[in-house]
Every structure is written in C-alpha cells, then in structure tokens.
Curated annotation (Swiss-Prot):
InterPro entries: Matrin/U1-like-C_Znf_C2H2 (IPR003604), Znf385 (IPR051845), Znf_C2H2_sf (IPR036236), Znf_C2H2_type (IPR013087)
Name of protein: Zinc finger protein 385C
A GO cellular component annotation in the UniProt record: nucleus
Major subcellular site: nucleus
Compositional bias ranges of the Basic residues kind: 255-277
Zinc finger (Matrin-type): 77-107, 225-259, 290-320
Compositional bias (Basic and acidic residues): 164-173
Species the sequence originates in: Homo sapiens
Gene Ontology molecular function, alphabetical: nucleic acid binding; zinc ion binding
Length: 422
C-alpha cells in the first residue's frame, strides 16, 4: 500500500513493471465473409452463368444486385421573353418557331428601337468637359492634350491632329479646339454634368409644327360643302366625284337634284307642294324657282309645275271658274253604298252555305217519307211506315253473322282438378 504524495503521480517502479495489455481487434472485413463484391460487376461474381442468361433475367439481376446508377440532373429549358419552361428540347424548339414567340420578340425589339433614339438624344444633350488648353504652358507637348470623344451619330468628332506634325503652335491648337467645339455643339456649356437647354425648345417647335401639319392635313381632307372628313386624298377625290357631292353642289347653286329618275329640289324627294303665303311680320323670303302665281302654289321641280299647268284645277282657275269644293255628302254616299254592297254579298254567301249543308247532312229519301207520314190520318199518323223503315235502314246494322257461335270450342275443356294435401 502506497501512502503519501507519491500516490498522485506515477511511480517509476510501476512504470517498469510489465503490465498485460488488451489486444486490439481489427475491423471486420465483409469482403472475406461474402462471396461477391460490392463494387464493379457484382452480378458477374455472384452468378457464374450470368453471360449465358436470358436478356430479361440479366436486366432483372443487374437492376436488383447491380450498382445504382447516379441520378441525372434534369435540364430546365426556359424562354425569358415569354416566361415559359419546357420539359424537352423539342418543346423549346417548337415554341421558338411559333407565332406567339415571334410576336413577343418583335414587340420587345420595337420597344428597344424606340428607346434607342431617346437615349441617343439624351447622350447628345449631355456635354463632356472640354480640356482647358489655356491653362497649359506654351511649351507643353501635344501628346498631353486629349482629343474630345464623339458625341453620338449626328455630332461630328473634332478633327484629330496629324501625327507627323508634333510641334504646332499653341494658338493653332486653341483655334482648332474652339472651332471644333462650336461646330459640333454650339449651345454646349463648359460645366460637366449640366444639360443644354437647346433641345427642349427645339422639340417643342417640332411638336408644334407636327400638330400644325396634322391640322392642315385634316383641313385638306375635309369637304365643307358636305361636312365630311376623310382619311386620305384618294378618298377625298372619290367623294368629290361622287353623286352626293354633286347633289350638294347643285343644291347650293339652286339647281334641282334628281332622285330616282325625277328632278327634286334640295328640300328632299318626299316634300309636298306648299302654298306661297306672306312671311310672318311682313318679312318675305326669296322668290321660289317653281311657282304658279295664279294658283298661289309652289312645287319642287319643273315636271311638277308642268303637271300642275296641265291639270283641271289650273285650267278652271285660268278660265275664271270657281273650284268645286269637295262636299261631305258625297263622301257619306260613297261609304253607304260600299256598306250596302258588303251586306248583300254576306247574305248571298250565308244562303249558299245553308243550302250546301242541308244537302250534305240529310239523305234524299227523307222528304218523301215525311210527306207519307203526314198524309196518314188517325192517331197512328206518327208511326213510321215499313217503306220508310226500309228506306232509312236498307240493311241491318248488326247482322246475325256477328252473333253466330263459332264452329269449335272457344276454349278446350280441362280435366278434373284434384286437391290433395302434401
């Protein structure tokens, strides 16, 4: 038994003594225990006759005991313009060849093309700072002076100096820079980042000129006579050569228009003749073109005026006769005669209908039988005579053949019925 502080620290004596140690067990190797391997061709080592098997058996064995194939990553094909995702390349190719994709692609290209001139105009409006050549010394070399970058397609870049001339005078450089800057962008300001106010009034002037052109075009494509606006010069020309425009022009000149083969005034084809009376309040209108002063009548055309001149009414007035007024008595007589004729026709039709109905419903021997019955005296006058019965019913309605019994039995006789308990 060891006591003292030496028990806490390992003793050299104990360290020198041989102590039995536990042997370490190696890890189990399943390859020595199993007859087949986990890698490579496992079915080949497990089944010796694998190569001579049926293809179906080979597929089943390789699927069951074979090494699992790595999962293939699914490819996603998408269209960023139409925001669609496809399952295969064939679907994507069919979509790219379709009309929907083509329409959207054209719309995107049109939007981009509209944005390009706007951005170019903004780039041209923004002016880059011009290098200060006056601050440099007269003896400064030319290579340190940078050339101004081009400011867009409509602006011309400043002329670059010839590389052969290396030492031009400083005044020539200043003149060239000032001329190039004035020719390229005259309203530019030397401060960087500030836009020139020149393009805005120019755009306003262009807009006003375009609106003025549009108004003038609308004015050119308008017919003030017919109050019609058309869309093109060809339509205006066709309208001017049309019948409606010609009628409106003739109406303005006072000439009669023609409607379905007969001349009609501008007031319309359905207007009736109007009597000319004095204007209200002593105001008189212009003298009509077709007017009969004798009858105080205004018509719409020359043909109507000729018809009026040849009418009986005008001739009577010309001869000094008073016009015959249309009396109410004559109209009543006409209506009464018409009503009488209608009533007569109705009565004749009713008589004819009664005759035809009586002839259809009553047989021909009935009147003779009735006269024979009425001729018999005594209380038996209403008894029908045998001749009348024979004439009314020449043959029996229900003959004896209808009630004749059949030759054989209608139903065969059945045997006796025996009732017995079970």
């Amino acid at each position: 038994m060891l006591l003292g502080p030496a028990s806490g620290a390992p003793s050299p004596l104990l360290a020198s003594l041989p102590l039995p140690t536990r042997p370490l067990q190696p890890p189990l190797d399943f390859k020595h225990l199993l007859a087949f391997h986990f890698n490579g061709a496992a079915p080949l080592s497990l089944f010796p006759n694998f190569s001579t098997m049926d293809p179906v058996q080979k597929a089943v064995i390789s699927h069951t005991f074979g090494v699992p194939s790595p999962l293939k990553k699914k490819l996603f094909i998408s269209c960023n313009i139409c925001h669609l995702r496809f399952n295969s390349a064939n679907q994507a190719e069919a979509h790219y060849k379709g009309h929907k994709h083509a329409r959207k692609l054209k719309a995107v290209e049109a939007a981009k093309s509209k944005q390009r001139p706007h951005t170019q105009a903004q780039d041209g409006a923004v002016v880059s700072p011009i290098p200060t050549l006056a601050s440099g010394a007269p003896g400064e070399p030319q290579s340190k002076v940078p050339a101004a970058p081009p400011l867009g397609p409509p602006l011309q870049p400043p002329p670059t100096p010839d590389p052969t001339c290396r030492e031009p005078a400083h005044s020539e450089l200043l003149d060239a820079a000032s001329s190039s800057s004035s020719s390229s962008c005259p309203p530019c300001s030397p401060e960087p980042g500030r836009e020139a106010p020149g393009p805005e009034p120019a755009a306003a002037a262009v807009g006003s000129s375009m609106s003025g052109e549009g108004r003038s075009e609308k004015g050119h494509l308008y017919c003030p006579t017919c109050k019609v606006t058309v869309n093109s010069a060809s339509q205006l020309q066709a309208h001017n050569t049309g019948a409606k425009h010609r009628w409106m022009m003739e109406g303005q000149r006072g000439a009669p228009r023609r409607s379905r083969g007969r001349p009609v005034s501008r007031g319309g084809a359905g207007h009736k003749a109007k009597r000319v009376t004095g204007g209200r309040g002593g105001r008189q209108g212009p003298s009509p073109a077709f007017h009969c002063a004798l009858c105080q009548l205004q018509v719409n055309s020359e043909t109507q005026l000729k018809q009026h001149m040849s009418s009986r009414r005008h001739k009577d007035r010309l001869a000094g006769k008073t016009p015959k007024p249309s009396s109410q008595h004559s109209k009543l007589q006409k209506h009464a005669a018409l009503a009488v004729s209608i009533l007569k026709s109705k009565l004749a039709l009713q008589k004819q209908l009664t005759k035809t109905l009586a002839a259809r419903f009553l047989p021909s021997p009935l009147p003779t039988a009735a006269t024979a019955i009425c001729a018999l005296p005594g209380p038996l006058a209403l008894r029908p005579a045998p001749t009348a019965a024979t004439t009314l019913f020449p043959a029996p309605i229900l003959g004896p053949a209808l009630f004749r019994t059949p030759a054989g039995a209608v139903r065969p006789a059945t045997g006796p019925i025996v009732l017995a308990p079970y």
